[in-house]
Amino acid sequence: MPAKQTSGKGAKKAGKAKGRPAGASKTRRRKRKESYGIYIYKVLKQVHPDTGISSKAMSIMNSFVNDVFERIAGEASRLAHYNKKSTISSREVQTAVRLLLPGELAKHAVSEGTKAVTKYTTSK
């Protein structure tokens, strides 16, 4: 019996099979968009149980929450940097809230934040 031809025109390459890998589907999965939507909806239902929210209003609220988050995080980061700290603690966040939010709103935000941190630490 003659030896198999491994090079030249008629040689077949062994190795990777063409096509999709096992378990892959035809359609690509869309990347999930993260949003505060479910949390905004939960708070809305706590405050006004009989009120709904449109998708446009939800989008505006989501943008608002992202904006406030970025402002607080940026200010807290700056405060940590000024004090030569590499970690943002609740103290930096609290100070950032006091600097960014006006008067009574800052007081309420600080008290709610303190309450949330206390609840979290006691549940651990």
Swiss-Prot record:
Residues 10-19 have a biased composition (Basic residues). The keyword Metal-binding does not apply. SMART domains: H2B. There is a cross-link at residue 119 (Glycyl lysine isopeptide (Lys-Gly) (interchain with G-Cter in ubiquitin)). It comes from the Eukaryota. Residues 1-32 are annotated as: Disordered. It is found in: Nucleus; Chromosome. Keywords: Chromosome, DNA-binding, Glycoprotein, Isopeptide bond, Nucleosome core, Nucleus, Ubl conjugation. Monoubiquitination of Lys-119 gives a specific tag for epigenetic transcriptional activation and is also prerequisite for histone H3 'Lys-4' and 'Lys-79' methylation. GlcNAcylation at Ser-111 promotes monoubiquitination of Lys-119. It fluctuates in response to extracellular glucose, and associates with transcribed genes. The keyword DNA-binding applies. GO terms for cellular component: nucleosome; nucleus. Glycans are attached at residue 111. Pfam families: Histone (PF00125). One of its GO terms (molecular function) is protein heterodimerization activity. The nucleosome is a histone octamer containing two molecules each of H2A, H2B, H3 and H4 assembled in one H3-H4 heterotetramer and two H2A-H2B heterodimers. The octamer wraps approximately 147 bp of DNA. Core component of nucleosome. Nucleosomes wrap and compact DNA into chromatin, limiting DNA accessibility to the cellular machineries which require DNA as a template. Histones thereby play a central role in transcription regulation, DNA repair, DNA replication and chromosomal stability. DNA accessibility is regulated via a complex set of post-translational modifications of histones, also called histone code, and nucleosome remodeling. Belongs to the histone H2B family. This is Late histone H2B.2.1. It comes from Psammechinus miliaris (Green sea urchin). The lineage of its organism: Eukaryota, Metazoa, Echinodermata, Eleutherozoa, Echinozoa.
